[in-house]
Amino acid sequence: MPDKSTIEKAKKDKAEGKSASTQAGEFVHDEIEKIRKGKHGARSPQQAIAIGLSEARRAGVDLPAPKTGGEALKKKAAQDEKRGKSNKPVSAKRSRARVEALKKEPTNTVSSGALSKQAKKAAKKRSVTDRSKAAKKAATTKGPTQRSAAAKKAARTRARKK
């Protein structure tokens, strides 16, 4: 079950006109923090992300099912979306069983190294034009000071790679 503060952050993001994936990012971040604190574990970084996205859909974030992916994934996303629209409370027994199962999983799967590896792997799957388009879109949402800081950081990275 997501924290009230996470739901509030997601609502704030929605009010600011941010995308559904940004709103869902709050839930993913919350899930990673829970695992790092040792409340429970995850088998892989992908599982931690999937749990966060599922919680986001169940909390009412209008996050569509992914275009790519298997039938089971799309079915689960649709199920979560439907759950987000209903007001039926979560069964305590089911919720407890979920946490108990996750407690048996490792917590080192969301270390900074593991998440960095996951992010790089995910980025490699995207085309250069797609990544470039996303970067340009991100730049437009930043203010001038943030843009300047990002440009300086990019310049430092380029200099380091030479």
Across the structure, where does each feature detected by a protein language model lie?
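A charge-rich, low-complexity, intrinsically flexible signal that marks solvent-exposed coils, linkers
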Residues: 1-162
